[in-house]
Structure formats: C-alpha cells, structure tokens
Amino acid sequence: MDASCLIGLSKVQMETLPLQLYTKVIIPPAVQAEFGGAVEGYIVQPPSNRVHVQTLRLMLGAGESEVIALGVELSQGGEQVEMVLDDLQARRIALSYGLRIVGTVGLLIRAKQSGYIESVRAILQQMRASGFRCSPELFRRAIELAQEGDD
C-alpha cells in the first residue's frame, strides 16, 4: 500500500479499513516514514532487493518504489499480492510486472460491497475536502460503481 492511500484514509479516520478487507496488510519502511509512523495491525517489511528499489527510484518516489519491489518479491515467493497504488506511473509499472493493483477509490468500493462502509460518496467527499486528489471523472465513476446514483 502506498502512502497516499494511507494518508487519505487517515484523514477520515479510516486507516484500519484495509485490515478488514485483507488477511494482512504489508507496507515498506518508506511508506511508514511518508505516513509519519506506524499503523496498528500493519506489517512493516522492507524489500530485500535494494538494487531493484534504486532502479524504480529513477521513475518513482521512495514509497511507490518499495511497494512495487516488495510486491514483486512477495509474488515471486508464491504469495497472493494486491498492490494498493494511486500514482498512475506506479500503477503502470506494477502492471508491467503482472501485479494486481487497486487504488484507494477501488478499496472504498470494495469496502462498501463487503458491508464495511455505507457510502463511498460521503467518504470520498470528506477525503477530497481534506486534500485527497480525485478527478471529477473518477469520483463520478466511483459513485456509479458503488451504485449510489448520479452526482
């Protein structure tokens, strides 16, 4: 999970939501540092291939680089991995490695479908008001997918 998702969720006091959706949530040290501390229940694990991280750093931020490098390592080790990434370039790179991805908005839609939240619209509006970037088109699409009517 990248820091933008964690920060966005924390601004609406929902940083533990991913723990309800996944059996375990792993973040690398760079994401923990960008977030500004630990989150109860999250596992902090550094990627072992620092060369891979440094190569990714040529194109991405520290958090996204460590998330993708760690995702590659875990998936090669046989784990079922889904990366939570919002940055478009990071998403493209993760997909090029064959990794499964979802963004913060997708996480909210899944949470509603699973019965953990009542309204994607209300949470996204709160997140946007606190500085979370979500284009009008993505907002509209999220409301549509969450079956919450037109905006």
What feature does the model see in each segment?
Residues 30-32, 91-151:
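Acidic, PIN/NYN-like endoribonuclease modules and their adjacent C-terminal/linker elements
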Residues 3-82, 88, 97-99:
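Active-site-proximal, substrate-binding regions of enzyme catalytic domains
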